[in-house]
A protein has these predicted regions:
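Conserved small-domain helix->loop->beta segment predominantly found in fold-type I
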Residues: 9-90, 94-103, 116-122
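PLP-dependent enzyme catalytic core of the Aspartate aminotransferase-like
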Residues: 87-88, 97, 103-157
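Flexible, glycine/proline-enriched loop segments at strand-loop-helix junctions
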Residues: 1
Length: 157
């Protein structure tokens, strides 16, 4: 779980700094509205790991921390951009959760929540541009590079 969290945090930070991303939903980022709740809900062993991680991997102004392997984000644009991003990924596989340690990506509006009427999905914040990532335990740099190249492929023309 540590590797999932560390990788997910790196992916979330990469997405957050991208001009092609509208917003990132990851409780370990200070920008998340429930980041304090997420931190205080950690069990003692996870809290110990997070505090050690922050001590050795974060600057004083960076209050982020590894929190699960799930990252959601809204790509700028709509379904066309979201689908292009997903098909441009090389490491992340397009699939719903398979219970493994490999990185997966999905478009909830078309996959897990496809049976919900569009108007209801919008009320729930599940638009056509929402992408959900299950970040695996591959090399962090490889995952970050995959995100960056897929974003470039999507928006480069």
């Amino acid at each position: 779980m540590k590797a999932h969290g560390v990788n997910a945090l790196a992916v979330a930070k990469t997405l957050q700094s991208s001009p092609y991303v509208q917003d990132v939903l990851y409780p370990g980022l200070p920008s998340h509205p429930q980041t304090a709740l997420a931190y205080h809900s950690l069990p003692p062993h996870a809290l110990k790991f997070v505090d050690q991680y922050r001590k050795h991997n974060s600057s004083p102004e960076d209050n982020s921390f590894p929190y699960s392997g799930m990252v959601s984000f809204r790509i700028k644009g709509g379904a066309e951009e979201a689908n292009k991003f997903l098909t441009s990924m090389r490491i992340f596989s397009l699939a719903e959760s398979l219970g493994g340690v490999e990185s997966l990506a999905e478009l909830p509006a078309e996959m897990t929540h496809g049976s919900i009427p569009p108007a209801e999905r919008e009320l729930l914040g599940i638009g056509d541009n929402l992408i959900r990532l299950s970040v695996g335990v591959e090399e962090t740099e490889d995952l970050v590079h995959d995100i960056e190249q897929a974003l470039e492929a999507t928006f480069s023309g």
